[in-house]
Amino acid sequence: MIRIYTQLEQGEAWLRRYSDRLPLFTCILGFTETGLIPGISAAGRTPEDRKYTACADAEFLYYGAEHQPQYPLPPLTAGASPVLISRAVVEAFNMPVYLFNAGLPQSPAIPAIDLGGCPAKCLSTGAAMELTTVEHLFKQGLLWGERLAAEVPEGYVILSECVVGGTTTALAMLTGLGINAAGKVNSSHPVCNHEQKWQLVQQGLEAGKEAGGQGVGCRGDKSPIDPLKLVAAVGDPMQVVVAGMAIAASRGCGVMLAGGTQMLAVYALASAIAETYNLSWQPTAVVVATTRWVAEDSTGGTVELALNIGKNSQYPQIMTPPLLATKLSFANSQYPQLQAYEQGFVKEGVGAGAACIAANLYKNWQQHQLLQAIENQIQRLLDR
């Protein structure tokens, strides 16, 4: 049920080490005004819907299908929110869940830990966040990473995200760090909107340079980059929090970065921050976990992107992380909302792929058990 796409030996060793452990499941919620641009994301049918996607997903993850939500799951162009997958696993194993508000336009209707961040402006401005906010969020990430690791000293933490428009800020982060990512990221669309993303990223990196953002460069620049300034220019609040959490948690437990493009960007960011600020961490304790819909998306290039992280002239010591994916399939699902995943809609989010990998590691769940649990979630939602 698990395929390793890069760093086979390291990935296998990681899976063996944590094969029977129940992880902590965390989701870091953030927002970028990039997500409001028409056509940028399918994680909510309209820009107005997308303002509330993170709140809705968090509420469903925490309370489940029977709860009458303050923020209902938003209508999608096709498919259903990947939180259905994550919730199915979290509920089945009574997995501890921690939710963090890194910067949302409104407070979620759940007991989330507020990290004192704020939503990011559109990355095209080159001034997405104040540097002081980024530094504060990074410190919060370090603090909570250490706390979470202390809860599972022999286990691992799943660090997941919910940020609409987050694959575009991921492209900006990777490009700014000198990694060849153009045309290789994923999206919630069946065919990735590479051109739209790339134009925004070029605009943002250029604007960041013109505004005097020292260390905000485009691929090909040889000067080293201050990664925190790069986040302030073109990032989103989730990225720097999870980078901090991963660095600190890796010192004491395993870390599963739960997502595709977005978590490859976070891994690269964490590596760059650790080098720039001389912070100790254990990159071999970290894996990136996603779905096969991301890893095998023919309109992206996730595996190539993971490999490119290890071919970076600006940060030559950054290694390619192990990229894992669940083999979960919805081809035989009776629900068209789930079959849509096989047509390329949605693909990943809220740690869906990582949750399935965790279920297989912990209790050897296979395709039929996962599908049954997920279909049970969708039926209860329809019955509500």
From Swiss-Prot:
GO molecular function: nicotinate-nucleotide-dimethylbenzimidazole phosphoribosyltransferase activity
InterPro entries assigned to the protein according to its UniProt record, in alphabetical order: Nict_dMeBzImd_PRibTrfase, Nict_dMeBzImd_PRibTrfase_arc, Nict_dMeBzImd_PRibTrfase_sf
Signal peptide: none
UniProt similarity note: Belongs to the UPF0284 family.
Name of the featured protein: UPF0284 protein alr0297
Species per Swiss-Prot/TrEMBL record: Nostoc sp. (strain PCC 7120 / SAG 25.82 / UTEX 2576)
